[in-house]
A protein has these predicted regions:
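Acidic, metal-coordinating catalytic segment for phosphate/diphosphate chemistry
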Residues: 1-44
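A broad, low-specificity signal for short, low-complexity segments enriched in glycine/proline
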Residues: 2-8, 14-18, 57, 75-82, ...
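Short, flexible coil/turn micro-motifs enriched in small/turn-prone residues
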Residues: 5, 26, 65-66, 71, ...
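Short, well-ordered turn and helix-capping elements at secondary-structure junctions
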Residues: 17, 31, 70-72, 104
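Active-site segment of metal-dependent pyrophosphate-handling enzymes
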Residues: 72, 92-105
Length: 105
């Protein structure tokens, strides 16, 4: 589902460049991006050989919290492909062997 109007306030959406997502629908009234409705996503825990975990602060999402790499799957992508793409987009790292440790629906 692709939004034309904000589901919260009804304002017509504009196209705005948002972080590493590129241009996307954005509610200038609510000050938030509206992602296409797609039910599957990934959350990736990225750790190095010392077991140090990468955390992100994405100000366009929240200025108060850190988060793990995450993102919506694109049509036709596997969870592993999504994890590789999102880690590349958000951390600038290349991962070669992503491992699925669990799923939840």
């Amino acid at each position: 589902m692709r939004f034309t109007y904000c589901p919260d306030c009804g304002t017509k959406l504009i196209q705005k460049e948002v972080g590493d997502e590129g241009f996307m629908p954005y509610c200038d009234n609510c000050k938030k991006p509206l992602f296409d409705m797609f039910s599957s996503c990934i959350i990736a825990l990225v750790a190095n050989e010392k077991q140090e975990v990468a955390l992100l602060r994405q100000n366009y999402i929240s200025t108060d919290y850190y988060n793990l790499v995450s993102g919506y799957m694109k049509p036709g992508e596997t969870a592993e492909e999504t994890a590789v793409r999102e880690v590349g987009e958000e951390l600038g790292l290349t991962i070669n062997e992503p491992k699925i440790t669990g799923t939840y629906w």
